[in-house]
Amino acid sequence: MQSPIVITGMGTVSPLGCGVKAGWERLLTGHSGISLITRFDTGDLPVKVAGSVPGIDEDPAAGFDPNRVAVAKERRKLELFSLYALAAAEEALTQANWYPTSDADRQATATIVGSGIGGFPTITQAQNTLSTRGHRRLSPFTVPAFLANLAAGNVSIRYGLRGPLGCPVTACAAGLQAIGDGMRLIRNGETDVAIVGGAEACIDPLSLASFHAMKALSTEQEDPASASRPFDRARDGFVMGEGAGILVIETLAHAEARGATPLAILSGYGTSADAHHITAGPEDGRGAAEAMRTALRMARLAPDAINHINAHATSTQVGDRAEIAALRNTFGDALAGIPISATKSATGHLLGAAGGVESIFSALSVMHNRLPPTQNLKDVDQGLDDLDFVSGAARDYPTQHVLCNGFGFGGVNAALIISKI
């Protein structure tokens, strides 16, 4: 019998702060990481709010301090999404106590960190420099800063990890697909340990304006904390977030052999394509349902064995409806008895980093038997009254298996099942 694949380390940078402990505690207590944008002047942009990672000055307890991640000279070469990935990787590797020094261990450690957009702000800044100051003023680090695979590359370089290196660039499913890719590499015997997850940082004027042109973003301004409202009748779009979620995964046998503590089991994974539309999934959610069914088959679980669902739930009208259709397609009548959380209500949508961060939230639910609340769910959308949304406050709940979903543009779907040790 194959040894199960387990999580031995976790690290997060999110709008709820830096570090798994701070982010989890704030999520459970109903803290919102969504606020007015102060990083730049939003001018006449109708989008004024985002899930920004707090800086150390505004959040001394859990703010992001780039000086702790890299010295000033090194930071010139790094886009923000890479800095977030490095910070989250350090936390995860420390918890896992995995700092390989032998050639064999370094070659047996994969680094798979997804990103939907990569260093998009660097591209817009470079274009501005080119237009106003000429090509001679462009930084030689422009290209290596913005390439999406450089989050994975920088983690690999820093820790000398010489195993497989990869970066799913699959929009909002990238983080979950990175985890799935790492699971496959371990199961196929290509690597013993994998550093997996996602990183994203694209809160800038062009990104916001472009997503707004698609009518995808919330335009709430008066009460930023209420802007992300998954499954609520009044939802008006997603809130852009940023951050990174990184996990260390390996087989249980490998973890026990080196004295590591397993935190949770990655018991099932599935991915699929809608083959339908570049930005919208089919109304019946058939592609997403297929990813969930594949994950259930891998985990050898019946649908009613799932105790909790961490929904993708971005707070768009079309997306939330399609996900519920997919869940009904997958779980049938059992869905009414499964509590559902939508953590993007607290963080906004971290795009390619969402799967990394939300898989960690899912693992914590399994570990602590605690379900995070869905914020801002005041008026449940039509046709959803039969479902059990965790709202208002966190819930104590016996949790053996959690399903975590991630879907993205292009019709990509991913589903991950995390189980108790």
Model region roles, listed by residue range:
Residues 1-74, 253-265, 360-374, 419-421:
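ACP-dependent fatty acid/polyketide chain-elongation machinery
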Residues 4-8, 35-36, 46, 222-299, ...:
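Condensing-enzyme catalytic core mediating Claisen C-C bond formation in acyl metabolism
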Residues 7, 28-170, 199-208, 303-319:
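Conserved beta-ketoacyl condensing-enzyme motif
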Residues 9, 27, 89, 111, ...:
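Conserved small-residue
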Residues 15-22, 69-90, 138-147, 165-180, ...:
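Active-site pocket-shaping loop/turn-to-helix segments
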Residues 46-55, 122, 201-228, 270-290, ...:
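Active-site-adjacent elements of ketosynthase-type condensing enzymes
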Residues 85-95, 148, 156-200, 238-260, ...:
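Active-site-proximal alpha-helical scaffold in enzymes
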Residues 132-139, 177-180, 184, 193, ...:
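Glycine-/small-residue-rich "gating" segment that lines the acyl/pantetheine channel
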